[in-house]
Design a protein with these regions (language model features):
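A conserved segment at the C-terminal end of the G1
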Residues: 3-18
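Short, surface-exposed amphipathic charged segments that create phosphate/polyanion-binding patches used
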Residues: 148-164
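Internal gly/pro-rich beta-alpha loop/helix module
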Residues: 108-109, 122-138, 143-146, 159, ...
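Histidine-centered active-site loop/cap adjacent to the catalytic His
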Residues: 164-171
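ATP-dependent carboxylate-amine ligase catalytic core
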Residues: 14-105, 117-125, 129-131
Length: 172
């Protein structure tokens, strides 16, 4: 995922397109998790975005339960992107699938880099189940790009596509 974010960011930078990335993990500061044109968000805008995300989490906690650290961070990132008027962002998902906090972002296109037996307690315990879950990462009828996939234990590669409504998939 990180390599795809870096590659797309480099292409956007070369084209002169202002954009944000949400790389992970951070090495020194949470601010590294939201970068605009390759630079971490400044401390004050980041702190303001976190404060707004915490306020929003408090407002809905009674209905949906407490937010996780990742959900609050994603909320802060999306708020920062809104405040900075970012129209192009490369958002790296967490665990992937419909339960991932980044799924709230309507990015218009999704990239599934690979499907493996990870986050099984949330995504399923088979490659097929995980592929279907990760396939819902994107918006229906929006483009979905995917890296080279190989059949594992007889599961067809096309199981990574969420539904017949997916507009197209680029096979690498």
């Amino acid at each position: 995922k990180g390599s795809v974010v870096a590659l797309v960011s480099a292409a956007l930078r070369a084209a002169g397109i202002r954009h944000a990335t949400t790389p992970k993990p951070h090495l020194v500061s949470y601010r590294e998790r939201v970068q605009i044109d390759g630079q971490p968000l400044a401390p004050l805008p980041f702190a303001q975005a976190v404060a707004r995300a915490l306020d929003a989490a408090d407002q809905i906690e009674e209905r949906v339960g407490p937010a996780t650290e990742f959900e609050i961070l994603v909320g802060a990132i999306f708020e920062a992107l809104r405040q900075e008027k970012i129209t192009t962002a490369i958002v790296e998902v967490g665990l992937g699938g419909r339960l991932d906090a980044t799924h709230a972002w309507d990015g218009g296109v999704a990239v599934v880099t690979n499907v493996g037996l990870d986050h099984q307690q949330y995504l399923g315990d088979t490659i097929e189940a995980i592929a279907k879950e990760k396939g819902v990462t994107h918006i229906t009828n929006a483009p979905m790009l995917r890296g080279r996939m190989v059949s594992v234990k007889g599961v067809p590669v096309d199981k990574v596509e969420a539904s017949p409504e997916a507009a197209w998939a680029l096979r690498g």
